[in-house]
């Protein structure tokens, strides 16, 4: 009889945070919203808060960066560790150290699905439909996958069954699609700057932005709009038609997450050939099933917010069963290892985190070390051939462990 590898049990889980409300502005890391001054990601982007004039100029003005980065580390009995980062900050640390630890410690490093199911069910009474608790569960799940990969000596994508393509091609999200084209990306997605409170004038301004970028980028480069939950159905339909002459590939997340009927109406009334996409701020498997049933062309879960890699794999299966694409919200290595195994993810997102989008910068800088970035808009699978997710934790960051058990 052949010997079967004996896997260790998990000895301890630990949680740190960095950045957030008490830190200096611009910590970056897992909370990529936390950037310094004069950064495109915080420059008059339309949001659900834009209707309040005190909060329309900056997303940080209403507190988008108050949570900070959560870092979860799991240690096996043999001393090996896995870790991951997400956006949950100090409150996520409390949930891990004071509640979720009981479902993690003492389990085999391969018991990822069991731990995941126990975490989901044990937090159901206070997690609702996602949010902070789901971000925290996602971070734990990713850390477990990282540990499992390191213990068995395989990259996470091989644990999922292996790559279905040799490389991942990317579009870039940022304020300058024209610069993204020069860097070799297949497309560029811009934020909208105006919303229903701005009336038809807002539609004209955002459509003019798309027209200008179409002229700069030429006809064959993809252009998309990210509306970040800032619109209502009527406004979104008007904006979609105003941008149709400029060959907009898709219009994204126009409505708040739970407006499923609104997404169905938007899809029904969108210009022919223009895709309707959403999912970044959906936090449960059921919400993605409902989104899929309402005709979304592309589902866009964030693996750090939707329940982790374990849930992302299930979301991809739902999308595949309906002939839909799943293109995760940019999550660096945590989505790279997933999408290279999905047959219904022909491309992926890279979030430009340099202030003016003119240079390539790792998305979760500075918290991750050895984080890969696309070269000519692509990442080859060989770049991912390291155990786990293939990155290291930068312990020189100001990591704080406020709780223990």
Curated annotation (Swiss-Prot):
Where does the record place the catalytic residues?
329 (proton acceptor)
Q: Which InterPro entries match?
A: Enolase-like_C_sf, Enolase-like_N, Enolase_C-like, L-Rhamnon_dehydrat, Mandel_Rmase/mucon_lact_enz_CS, Mandelate_racemase_C, Mandelate_racemase_N_dom, RHMD-like
Which top EC class is given? lyase
Per its record, the protein catalyses: L-rhamnonate = 2-dehydro-3-deoxy-L-rhamnonate + H2O
Q: Which SMART domains does this UniProt record tie to the protein? A: MR_MLE
Report the co-factor binding details.
Binds 1 Mg(2+) ion per subunit.
Binding positions (substrate): 33, 59, 349
Cofactors per UniProt? Mg(2+)
Keywords, in A-Z order: Lyase, Magnesium, Metal-binding
Q: Name one GO biological process term.
A: amino acid catabolic process
In this UniProt entry, which residues are annotated as the site Transition state stabilizer? 349
State the superkingdom.
Bacteria
The EC designation for this entry is: 4.2.1.90
MF terms from GO for this chain are:
L-rhamnonate dehydratase activity; magnesium ion binding
Q: What does this protein do?
A: Catalyzes the dehydration of L-rhamnonate to 2-keto-3-deoxy-L-rhamnonate (KDR).
Q: What else is known?
A: Reaction proceeds via a syn dehydration.
Q: State the name under which the record lists this protein.
A: L-rhamnonate dehydratase
Q: Which organism is it from?
A: Escherichia coli O6:K15:H31 (strain 536 / UPEC)
- Name of the gene: rhmD
């Amino acid at each position: 009889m052949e010997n079967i590898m004996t896997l260790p049990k998990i000895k301890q889980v630990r949680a740190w945070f960095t950045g957030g409300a008490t830190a200096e502005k611009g910590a970056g890391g897992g909370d990529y919203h936390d950037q310094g001054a004069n950064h495109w990601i915080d420059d008059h982007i339309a949001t659900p808060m834009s209707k309040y004039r005190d909060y329309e100029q900056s997303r940080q003005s209403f507190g988008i960066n108050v949570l900070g980065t959560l870092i979860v580390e799991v240690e096996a009995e043999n001393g090996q560790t896995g870790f991951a980062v997400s956006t949950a900050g100090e409150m996520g640390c409390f949930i891990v150290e004071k509640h979720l630890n009981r479902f993690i410690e003492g389990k085999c490093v391969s018991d990822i699905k069991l731990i995941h199911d126990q975490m989901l069910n044990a937090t159901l009474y206070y997690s609702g439909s996602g949010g902070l608790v789901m971000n925290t569960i996602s971070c734990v799940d990713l850390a477990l996958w990282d540990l499992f990969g390191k213990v068995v000596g395989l990259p996470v994508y091989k644990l999922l069954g292996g790559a279905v393509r040799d490389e991942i091609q990317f579009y870039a999200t940022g304020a300058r699609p024209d610069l993204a084209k020069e860097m070799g990306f297949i497309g560029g997605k811009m934020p909208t700057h105006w919303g229903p409170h701005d009336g038809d004038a807002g539609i004209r301004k955002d459509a003019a932005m798309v027209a200008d970028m179409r002229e700069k980028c030429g006809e064959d480069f993809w252009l998309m709009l990210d509306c970040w939950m800032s619109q209502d159905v009527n406004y979104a339909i008007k904006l979609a038609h105003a941008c149709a002459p400029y060959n907009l590939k898709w219009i994204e997340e126009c409505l708040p997450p739970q407006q499923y009927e609104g997404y169905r109406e938007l899809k029904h009334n969108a210009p022919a050939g223009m895709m309707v996409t959403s999912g970044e701020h959906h936090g449960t498997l059921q919400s993605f099933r409902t989104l899929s049933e309402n005709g979304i062309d592309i589902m866009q879960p964030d693996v750090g917010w939707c329940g982790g890699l374990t849930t992302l794999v299930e979301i991809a299966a739902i999308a595949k069963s309906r002939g839909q694409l799943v293109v995760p919200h940019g999550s660096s290595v945590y989505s790279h290892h997933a999408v290279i195994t999905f047959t219904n993810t022909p491309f992926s997102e890279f979030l430009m985190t340099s202030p003016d989008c003119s240079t390539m910068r790792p998305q979760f800088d500075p918290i991750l070390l050895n984080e890969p970035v696309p070269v000519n808009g692509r990442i080859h699978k060989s770049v991912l051939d390291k155990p786990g997710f293939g990155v290291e934790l930068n312990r020189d960051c100001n990591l704080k462990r406020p709780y223990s058990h």
